[in-house]
């Protein structure tokens, strides 16, 4: 039943780091968590963040620091930093707090599950054959040095009247092995026949557990 759980949540604080780093008491926790969700949803809709692989939110003394992991940092920064300043202003208006935006470049987008899933979704929306898009993604991921990759698409594939799921796998993708560094992401493609769901698992390597000093603790950190 390993396929029923989220590989990221399963490994958080073991081999994966938290995506939200802050402390909140009983009164603040829910408020901070909802605020994190709003920040992420806002950034996902911004054209400059379309190539973003993920967002990390940190809080310290009334301020918020958002790190945007992207394969296209120039698009997020904008001309002379104009886009970053615009994001800061809009996030401040959204949260009512000072927001600092950091940009982290994704060096190898072929090994990032979110970027691979988004790439497949865009191809399906452009009416590329879903099988062709999946096989191309598998090949590029394996060529980049992954130990294994699995891609699954679900929905009215090729306009079929009955929805179904199809998946392709290459290499080794263990689901119960905690030391396996599994990157996982989902995406959706909006087609004339309906929504096509995409899931991607990438086995990057085997790694040691995250040091205890880096653990934020379940009570003090939320993984939104």
Curated annotation (Swiss-Prot):
One of its GO terms (cellular component) is cytosolic small ribosomal subunit. SMART domains: KH. InterPro entries: KH_dom, KH_dom-like_a/b, KH_dom_type_2, KH_sf_prok-type, Ribosomal_S3_C_sf, Ribosomal_uS3_bac-typ, Ribosomal_uS3_C, Ribosomal_uS3_CS. Disulfide bonds: none annotated. GO terms for biological process: translation. Keywords: Ribonucleoprotein, Ribosomal protein, RNA-binding, rRNA-binding. Residues 39-107 form the KH type-2 domain. CDD domains: KH-II_30S_S3 (cd02412). GO terms for molecular function: mRNA binding; rRNA binding; structural constituent of ribosome. Pfam families: KH_2, Ribosomal_S3_C. Part of the 30S ribosomal subunit. Forms a tight complex with proteins S10 and S14. Belongs to the universal ribosomal protein uS3 family. Binds the lower part of the 30S subunit head. Binds mRNA in the 70S ribosome, positioning it for translation. This is Small ribosomal subunit protein uS3. It comes from Chlamydia trachomatis serovar A (strain ATCC VR-571B / DSM 19440 / HAR-13). The lineage of its organism: Bacteria, Pseudomonadati, Chlamydiota, Chlamydiia, Chlamydiales. The gene is rpsC.
């Amino acid at each position: 039943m390993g396929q029923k759980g989220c590989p990221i949540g399963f490994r958080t604080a073991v081999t994966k780091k938290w995506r939200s780093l802050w402390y909140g008491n009983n009164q603040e926790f829910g408020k901070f968590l909802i605020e994190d969700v709003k920040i992420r949803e806002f950034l996902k809709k911004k054209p400059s963040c379309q190539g973003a692989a993920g967002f990390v939110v940190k809080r310290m003394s009334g301020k918020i620091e958002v790190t945007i992991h992207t394969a296209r940092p120039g698009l997020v920064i904008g001309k002379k930093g104009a886009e970053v300043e615009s994001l800061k202003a809009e996030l401040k208006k959204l949260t009512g707090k000072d927001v600092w935006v950091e940009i982290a470049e994704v060096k190898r987008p072929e090994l990032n599950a979110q970027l691979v899933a988004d790439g497949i979704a865009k191809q399906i929306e452009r009416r590329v054959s879903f099988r062709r898009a999946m096989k191309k993604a598998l090949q590029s991921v394996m060529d980049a040095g992954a130990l294994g990759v699995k891609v699954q698409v679900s929905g009215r594939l090729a306009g079929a009247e009955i929805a179904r799921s199809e998946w392709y796998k290459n290499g080794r993708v263990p689901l119960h092995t905690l030391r396996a560094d599994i990157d996982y992401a989902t995406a959706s493609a909006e087609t004339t026949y309906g929504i096509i769901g995409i899931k991607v698992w990438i086995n990057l390597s085997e790694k040691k557990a995250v040091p205890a000093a880096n653990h934020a603790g379940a009570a003090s950190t939320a993984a939104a």
